[in-house]
């Protein structure tokens, strides 16, 4: 009881410290911003958030501002301000970036924004030495009290953990899922699989990064059709089909439109429409709808349909395929062009002709079914890419890892498998509880072994995605749901000895989270992170939140 009371006192003390820190920050904390320019005299004042001026006990100037990019692209990776701080006779140098705070005499400098000419920087300033110290101390005590609570033998948590009611479940969950698969009567013309795969091995500038064309093909197919393959064709076959057999593919009902109003507007009989359905005798059909007839839902659905129409149109014109790098000595890195882009006048004529006509030559060979010659031309194109963008391309290992990831990433069947096994094992567990029979150790071992295989598969996917992107894969809903699936499996292995139903719950939670991630997979992209999102602390925060959600889900299922 004495130990438990100490834990309770520590818990209440943590709340007092946290609230005291917040009050201290509100009353005595100072926040504002300061604008600095390279080459200007040091600044001794800054603007507070209330509009008033405040003095600094030192002066600060901007020595240099740096804007760094992801390799081979123009996507910003970080904003860095290098400062000179003058305090009496002393001069200190410090740097501020999106994920690095510079602190001097309890003044904290944060990177906020920068000037268009990249010669100036705006920094946020915070001065709150006492509020921060009180708040952080309070959170440390709060965490310590929670940990001590679980180790207290007389706590209600330990009593509930061994309570017989924990092992009885009175309500069964009924979850029915259905998978509807559509196959057309005929397959549209396409390249042989081997030839299409050679296209997938080209480099392409897409989503502000350089990746295999296979990635673009998969995301193009998924964006239009909702799945990564169409009528048994690979994503590369779909993409090259649209590129070289446009007249036939525009008649294919493969563009997914979910909204009934948009389906009616396009004259479609189902949820899949043709590209040809977007245009009528009087022009583009979606421009004919009156704004007064559009609500927020319809407007959003029309925008999504327009996006798919534009994506298909960009591919068919070649504008989507930025596969031709050109390195100008006046630029720090190569610029990637499509065959329809305006090319710089400084480009040599031979290079200009290659970019303008190489794809036309490939199309001619495709028309004559000279696929061996197509492969030779694709090899020449890739050699041109490697020569012109040398030093700016992803490594062969990373390039191969991305192609492996594209071939391995099948979330839908894994989600359905996990849900099916989870529901069946849950019903079996309930039946054995009703019959007062013990579960078979062999059965549990098989279930755990299969769950272990799912865990390894997910970890490989997450590892590949992290290696490809160059950051921890926790930056969007798709990635965080994958992480939550892993957390659910880990909790299953930790809890199943004390709580047998955790095996079924682990499968169900894994399946449900993967099912949710499928919504993100309908528009997935491995992109460069905005600088503020690449913080290790933010990644730790996401892991903690996902783990807590997994625990909460176990508690919810246990309550049912």
Where are the regions a protein language model picked out?
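Solvent-exposed, non-transmembrane regions of integral membrane proteins
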Residues: 1-560
């Amino acid at each position: 009881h004495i130990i438990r009371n100490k834990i309770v006192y520590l818990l209440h003390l943590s709340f007092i410290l946290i609230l005291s820190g917040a009050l201290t920050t509100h009353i005595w904390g100072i926040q504002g911003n300061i604008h600095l320019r390279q080459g200007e005299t040091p600044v001794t004042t800054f603007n507070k958030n209330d509009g008033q001026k405040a003095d600094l006990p030192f002066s600060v100037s901007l020595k240099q501002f740096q804007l760094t990019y992801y390799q081979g692209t123009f996507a910003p990776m970080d904003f860095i301000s290098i400062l000179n701080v003058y305090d009496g006779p002393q001069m200190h140098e410090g740097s501020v970036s999106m994920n690095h705070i510079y602190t001097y005499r309890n003044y904290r400098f944060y990177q906020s924004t920068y000037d268009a000419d990249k010669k100036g920087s705006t920094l946020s300033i915070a001065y709150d030495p006492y509020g921060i110290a009180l708040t952080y101390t309070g959170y440390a005590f709060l965490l310590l009290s929670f940990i001590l609570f679980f180790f207290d033998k007389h706590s209600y948590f330990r009593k509930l953990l061994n309570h017989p009611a924990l092992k009885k479940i009175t309500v069964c969950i009924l979850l029915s899922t259905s998978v509807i698969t559509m196959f057309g009567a005929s397959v549209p013309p396409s390249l042989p699989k081997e030839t299409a795969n050679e296209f997938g091995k080209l480099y392409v500038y897409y989503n502000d990064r350089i990746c295999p064309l296979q990635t673009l093909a998969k995301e193009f197919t998924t964006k239009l059709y909702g799945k990564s393959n169409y009528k048994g064709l690979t994503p590369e076959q779909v993409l090259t089909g649209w590129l070289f057999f446009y007249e036939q593919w525009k008649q294919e009902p493969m563009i997914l439109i979910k909204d009934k109003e948009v389906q009616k507007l396009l004259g479609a009989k189902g949820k899949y429409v043709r590209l040809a359905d977007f245009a009528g005798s009087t022009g583009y059909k979606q421009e004919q709808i009156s704004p007064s007839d559009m609500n927020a839902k319809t407007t959003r659905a029309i925008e999504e349909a327009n996006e798919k129409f534009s994506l298909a149109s960009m591919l068919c014109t070649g504008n989507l395929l930025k596969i031709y790098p050109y390195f100008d000595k006046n630029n720090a890195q190569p610029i990637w062009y499509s065959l329809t882009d305006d090319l710089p006048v400084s480009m040599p004529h031979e290079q200009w002709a290659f970019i303008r006509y190489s794809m036309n030559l490939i199309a001619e060979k495709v028309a004559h079914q000279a696929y061996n010659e197509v492969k030779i031309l694709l090899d020449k194109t890739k050699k041109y890419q490697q020569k012109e963008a040398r030093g700016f391309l992803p490594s062969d290992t990373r390039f191969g890892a991305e192609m492996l990831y594209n071939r391995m990433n099948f979330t839908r069947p894994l989600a359905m498998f996990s849900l099916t096994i989870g529901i069946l094992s849950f019903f079996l567990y309930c039946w054995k509880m009703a019959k007062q029979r013990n579960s078979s150790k062999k059965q549990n071992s098989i279930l755990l072994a299969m769950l272990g295989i799912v865990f390894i598969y997910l970890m490989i996917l997450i590892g590949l995605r992290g290696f490809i992107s160059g950051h921890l894969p926790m930056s969007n809903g798709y990635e965080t749901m994958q992480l939550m699936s892993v957390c659910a499996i880990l909790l299953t292995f930790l809890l199943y000895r004390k709580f047998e139903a955790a095996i079924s719950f682990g499968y169900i939670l894994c399946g449900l989270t993967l099912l949710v991630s499928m919504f993100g997979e309908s528009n997935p992209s491995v992109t460069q992170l905005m600088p503020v999102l690449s913080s290790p602390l933010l990644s730790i925060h996401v892991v903690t939140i996902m783990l807590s959600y997994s625990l909460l889900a176990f508690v919810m299922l246990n309550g049912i």
